A protein has these predicted regions:
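Acidic/His metal-coordination segments adjacent to aromatic residues that form catalytic metal sites
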Residues: 13-18, 74-87, 140-148, 216
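A beta-strand-loop signature enriched in Asp, Gly, Thr, and Trp
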Residues: 122-182
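Aromatic- and histidine-enriched alpha-helix N-cap/loop-to-helix transition segments
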Residues: 23-34, 88-103, 151-162, 181, ...
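A glycine-biased, small/acidic residue-tolerant capping/turn segment at secondary-structure junctions
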Residues: 196-212
Length: 226
């Protein structure tokens, strides 16, 4: 309620004063909007959805590449390029967003005028992301430069696998097109689960693509640290 009553107007440029008090990095779209959406559903008060929607769309305007149907991690990466000359789109960062969209759509009232925006965004992103799956069924740290990041990355792959199955189960994705992709991703993830329940090939904590040169073992909630 304090945030809603005292909205911030700082620039979302990453190094601008006060930018971190707003959702200036794509991970934040999982951290904050999902909570507002859930509170809005529990209380039934429109103000939580109104604030969430306004702030989300400001971040969307700042970080979403319409041409690529993917989010930059933050404004620092908009003009950066990978070794192959492609834009820098972080796998896990985009996973945070697709995961967030499932919660927002699930909790937002069916009649809310912006709900169609989130459904459309979800479909756009999953359509693009599905084309970036590798032959094994994984996604990589950098979505557009798998040559520089040849090892699979399972925190991004986990987010995308969840998002695919959620979209299928809720009728937002066509089974004929997306079910084979989702099953392939699930089987890929299952293949790197160790006997002790830990999963391999998780990128370390960070804010951008990093190489997974060894089989890093994390518990399933390691991604909570971003």
């Amino acid at each position: 309620d304090t945030l809603i009553a005292n909205p911030r107007h700082n620039s979302l440029s990453y190094y601008a004063d006060g930018s971190h008090s707003r959702w200036c990095w794509c991970d934040a779209l999982f951290m904050a909007p999902t909570s507002f959406a859930r509170i809005g559903k529990i209380t039934g008060e429109p103000k939580y959805f109104e604030f969430m929607d306004k702030e989300f769309q400001i971040t969307y305007d700042s970080l979403y590449s319409v041409a690529d149907s993917l989010f930059f991690r933050d404004t620092r990466y908009i003009n950066m390029r990978e070794q192959n000359g492609k834009k820098v789109f972080w796998g896990r960062g985009n996973g945070w967003v697709t995961g967030a969209l499932t919660f927002i759509i699930d909790n937002m009232p069916a009649q809310h005028p912006s709900r169609v925006f989130y459904i459309s965004l979800f479909r756009q992103m999953l359509k693009k992301i599905s084309t970036l799956q590798d032959k094994q069924g994984f996604w990589h740290s950098s979505l557009l430069d798998t040559a520089s990041y040849p090892m699979p990355e399972t925190s991004a792959s986990g987010f995308f696998t969840y998002s695919l199955f959620w979209g299928l189960n809720h009728g937002y994705l066509e089974k004929e097109e997306y079910l084979p992709i989702a099953k392939k991703a699930w089987n890929a993830l299952a293949s790197v689960v160790h006997e002790d329940g830990k999963i391999g090939y998780v990128q370390p904590i960070g804010a951008d693509p990093k190489k997974v040169d060894i089989c890093l073992l994390y518990t399933s909630d390691a991604a909570d640290d971003s």
